[in-house]
């Protein structure tokens, strides 16, 4: 049964103060979110106006700053292009808040899957350890990583702007190819679903081997052809740190949006979000990090053994 509106509103209020939910609340939240996300599409249609956001990576106070700059949810419609967890100190609170907002305002918020929304990656880059530290077990990690399998892979704003975390795939020429994928699974090591979450644009033409070890690099010729074939004006993606928070490339066929300022608390970059207005007009809002909070104790407590 869906949670009462009052319950979810109370949870959102609590999360806005960076106070984590109980394990039971997370379990119920994820179960409800699954019932919403399972009905969404691999290419989820989105109407304008909408504000498009890139990586957040557990930088909770910078997410609050994003909402301050861009407008609160649900007053502003948002589309997040993945990578909510890992690296920052507050992955639990960050992903909990975004999922709670999705459950409360399902038509006002679109949350896509990033390459970090995966069991394997989160065990290496911090989310798993954070869940153990904050809850004393891995149950919350399991609830969220099971939910991640349901996240849409891409979104399409007014049939014109194609949004996704990473980039294109040599296996996928059309949006219909993407629509036919079975997405409800762990991110594979290779293949089209992996490519959408891992690939990057590149200055060289054609397809290239990615230095990331997953996905591909794709040239301007590839992006131009993909946009032409599918009647698109723009590919909007995240996945790469860009110092100004946004970066046009490939003759403005592709834009990278990155929304974690001073990434990893040391990169010195600005963050940005992309406002797409009623008439599909585009406006970038840049922002600096929120004032530093007291960092939590992040020493890794290694359990005596792993079950």
UniProtKB/Swiss-Prot annotation:
Listed Pfam families: Metallophos
Residues found modified as Leucine methyl ester: 307
Functional summary from the UniProt entry: Associates with the serine/threonine-protein phosphatase PP2A regulatory subunits A and B' to positively regulates beta-oxidation of fatty acids and protoauxins in peroxisomes by dephosphorylating peroxisomal beta-oxidation-related proteins. Involved in the positive regulation of salt stress responses. May function by increasing chloride channel activities on vacuolar membranes.
Subunit structure: PP2A consists of a common heterodimeric core enzyme, composed of a 36 kDa catalytic subunit (subunit C) and a 65 kDa constant regulatory subunit (subunit A), that associates with a variety of regulatory subunits such as subunits B (the R2/B/PR55/B55, R3/B''/PR72/PR130/PR59 and R5/B'/B56 families). Also interacts with CHIP and TAF12B. Interacts with B'THETA. Interacts with CLC-A, CLC-B, CLC-C and CLC-G.
Residues binding Mn(2+) 1: 55, 57, 83
Reaction(s) catalysed (UniProt annotation): O-phospho-L-seryl-[protein] + H2O = L-seryl-[protein] + phosphate; O-phospho-L-threonyl-[protein] + H2O = L-threonyl-[protein] + phosphate
Keywords: Cytoplasm, Hydrolase, Manganese, Metal-binding, Methylation, Peroxisome, Phosphoprotein, Protein phosphatase, Stress response, Ubl conjugation
PTM comment text: Reversibly methyl esterified on Leu-307 by leucine carboxyl methyltransferase 1 (LCMT1) and pectin methylesterase 1 (PME1). Carboxyl methylation influences the affinity of the catalytic subunit for the different regulatory subunits, thereby modulating the PP2A holoenzyme's substrate specificity, enzyme activity and cellular localization. Phosphorylation of either threonine (by autophosphorylation-activated protein kinase) or tyrosine results in inactivation of the phosphatase. Auto-dephosphorylation has been suggested as a mechanism for reactivation.
Protein name: Serine/threonine-protein phosphatase PP2A-5 catalytic subunit
GO molecular function: metal ion binding; protein serine/threonine phosphatase activity
Cofactor(s), names only, from the UniProt record: Mn(2+)
Regulation: induction: Induced by salt stress.
Primary localization class, coarse: cytoplasm
Native organism: Arabidopsis thaliana (Mouse-ear cress)
Disruption phenotype: No visible phenotype under normal growth conditions, but mutant plants are hypersensitive to salt stress.
Gene: PP2A5
Locations listed in the record: Cytoplasm, Cytosol; Peroxisome
Comment on bound cofactor: Binds 2 manganese ions per subunit.
Active site: 116
Similarity-based family: Belongs to the PPP phosphatase family. PP-2A subfamily.
GO cellular component: cytosol; peroxisome
Keyword Metal-binding attached: yes
């Amino acid at each position: 049964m869906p949670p009462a509106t009052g319950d979810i509103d109370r949870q959102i209020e609590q999360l806005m103060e960076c106070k984590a939910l109980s394990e039971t609340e997370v379990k119920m939240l994820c179960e409800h979110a699954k019932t919403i996300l399972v009905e969404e599409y691999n290419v989820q249609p989105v109407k304008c106006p909408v504000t498009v956001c890139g990586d957040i990576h557990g930088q909770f106070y910078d997410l609050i700053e994003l909402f301050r700059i861009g407008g609160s949810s649900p007053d502003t419609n948002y589309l997040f292009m993945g990578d909510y967890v890992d690296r920052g100190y507050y992955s639990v609170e960050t992903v909990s808040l975004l999922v709670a907002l999705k459950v409360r305002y399902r038509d006002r918020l679109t949350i896509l899957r990033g390459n970090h929304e995966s069991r394997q990656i989160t065990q290496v880059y911090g989310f798993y350890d954070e869940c153990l530290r904050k809850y004393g077990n891995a149950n919350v990690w399991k609830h969220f990583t099971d939910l991640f399998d349901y996240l849409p892979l891409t979104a399409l704003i007014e049939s014109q702007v194609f949004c996704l975390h990473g980039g294109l795939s040599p296996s996928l020429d059309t949006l219909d190819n993407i629509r036919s994928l079975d997405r409800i699974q762990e991110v594979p090591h290779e293949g089209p679903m992996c490519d959408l979450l891992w690939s990057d644009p590149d200055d060289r033409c054609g397809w290239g081997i990615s230095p990331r070890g997953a996905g591909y690099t794709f040239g301007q010729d590839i992006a131009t052809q993909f946009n032409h074939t599918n009647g698109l004006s723009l590919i909007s993606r995240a996945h790469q740190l860009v110092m100004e928070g946004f970066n046009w490339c490939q003759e403005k066929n592709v834009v990278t949006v990155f929304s974690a300022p001073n990434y990893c608390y040391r990169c010195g970059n600005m963050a940005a979000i992309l406002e797409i207005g009623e008439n599909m007009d585009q406006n970038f809002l840049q922002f600096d990090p929120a004032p530093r909070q007291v960092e939590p104790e992040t020493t890794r407590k290694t359990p005596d053994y792993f079950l």
